[in-house]
Amino acid sequence: MPPVPNDKPFTLAGRTYQSRLLVGTGKYKDLEETRAAIEASGAEIVTVAVRRTNIGQNPGEPNLLDVISPERYTILPNTAGCFTAEDAVRTCRLARELLDGHKLVKLEVLADQKTLFPNVIETLKAAEVLIKDGFDVMVYTSDDPIIARQLAEMGCIAVMPLAGLIGTGLGICNPYNLRIILEEATVPVLVDAGVGTASDATIAMELGCEAVLMNSAIAHAQNPVLMAEAMKYAIEAGRLAYLAGRMPKKLYASASSPLDGLIR
């Protein structure tokens, strides 16, 4: 998106990005579709599930980094599939080893397989260890404003509350909690999980989120590459609308044209 005079840059760990759309790499039919969708999205940050995707830990198997180059994209390793703080910390350390000292990670510690809700207790434990270990932690969490505040205060560089359950496409289920998190935010707030279509992404940005991370909404679309492009423009439209400031809602009608000087 071209720079807007009254906008502030989207910055993570000291690096500024033009795109406010972050995308995942799972659930595509093959690596070529993955590559094409990510390119169409315009995203600069690509998140990778270290426990599910080969980024060098399995020599001889197809390597995602052969099609998603770390020279072009910021690779964001994530801890999807981890259900304890210990597993999440171990996974982040593996990613750092595989990516030559890479410090930026997305922490997620899940509570159970059915809901994939974040386990906030284990998340807090893992975040504390990772921050002390020198990682730049972006953290997937619930939409509880108190937990979001605690994660920011302990040193997470971005807080990523869910908009809906992972992979459901339900959209922004609780915009009111998100608004409270955004009002109190001292670090970037990104919606993570729940987005189903372009309008959901736009709503998240209109609320004031710095960015949106998504995977299923693109990968599960009938045409993932086309949906990726739609999301690119949805994010831009939402950001512009947020900066422009929407008109206030009113109970009664208000004519667009003044009544003075009517032809009679």
UniProtKB/Swiss-Prot annotation:
Any one of the GO BP annotations: thiamine diphosphate biosynthetic process
Binding site for 1-deoxy-D-xylulose 5-phosphate: 167, 193-194, 215-216
Keywords: Cytoplasm, Schiff base, Thiamine biosynthesis, Transferase
Reactions catalysed according to its record: [ThiS sulfur-carrier protein]-C-terminal-Gly-aminoethanethioate + 2-iminoacetate + 1-deoxy-D-xylulose 5-phosphate = [ThiS sulfur-carrier protein]-C-terminal Gly-Gly + 2-[(2R,5Z)-2-carboxy-4-methylthiazol-5(2H)-ylidene]ethyl phosphate + 2 H2O + H(+)
Pfam family, one: ThiG
Catalytic residues (UniProt): 106 (schiff-base intermediate with dxp)
Gene3D superfamilies (alphabetical): Aldolase class I
GO cellular-component term (any): cytoplasm
Entry's EC annotation: 2.8.1.10
Pathway: Cofactor biosynthesis; thiamine diphosphate biosynthesis
Segments traversing the membrane: none
One GO molecular-function entry: thiazole synthase activity
Places the protein is found: Cytoplasm
InterPro entries, per the entry: Aldolase_TIM, Thiazole_synthase_ThiG, ThiG
Role: Catalyzes the rearrangement of 1-deoxy-D-xylulose 5-phosphate (DXP) to produce the thiazole phosphate moiety of thiamine. Sulfur is provided by the thiocarboxylate moiety of the carrier protein ThiS. In vitro, sulfur can be provided by H(2)S.
Family per similarity comment: Belongs to the ThiG family.
Subunit structure, interactors included: Homotetramer. Forms heterodimers with either ThiH or ThiS.
Name recorded for this polypeptide: Thiazole synthase
Annotated organism of origin: Stutzerimonas stutzeri (strain A1501) (Pseudomonas stutzeri)
Lineage: Bacteria, Pseudomonadati, Pseudomonadota, Gammaproteobacteria, Pseudomonadales
Gene: thiG
